[in-house]
Amino acid sequence: SDPSQDFYGSPDPDYLKTTIPLFQKAGLPAQNIQDILQTGIYITNAVKTPKSDYTIERSTIETSLPYLEKELSLFPNTKVIMLMGDVAKKAFNMLTKKATGKNAVPSTSTYKLRTTELYYETIRIIPSYIITGGNILIEKSKAQMASQDITTMLRLIQ
């Protein structure tokens, strides 16, 4: 719950300790968040408050939605949105359901959705795995898939 450990909170935050290696594995020679930003990629959290329990309640996601919605509106030329983890999928579906009456991402496992081309309006949606926290580096198959998904995103934004 230390804000300095968020993506943009300090020069070497905890969140980037797993994120940077995944981007590097995907072919982006990033050393820091600025390198990722220079590529036209903005990383954010779907939930804007620190996690206080193992799971994140729907009400916690709902509290963050206005901030996430405003944040997304700052990027009118977005080509791709990667949803890194189940909470990101839930939050994005809550936003799209509010706007269109339906979910942009089917409630199917990420593993099954990864190869499906999903769109919200003209924006390509790529469901993937959460890229922060030590577990992603332990779960080698998820790290591999997240890296492959980042490669797909990089190809689409070039």
Each language-model region and where it sits:
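Membrane-associated lipid acylation/remodeling enzymes share a hydrophobic transmembrane-juxtamembrane segment
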Residues: 77-87, 94-95, 101-112
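C-terminal capping/extension of enzyme domains
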Residues: 54-69, 98-158
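Internal catalytic-core helix/loop-beta-alpha segment
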Residues: 40-86, 90
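Short coil-to-beta-strand
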Residues: 38-44, 123-126
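Short amphipathic alpha-helical segments
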Residues: 5-7, 93-96
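Adenosine ribonucleotide-centric catalytic and binding domains
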Residues: 1-37
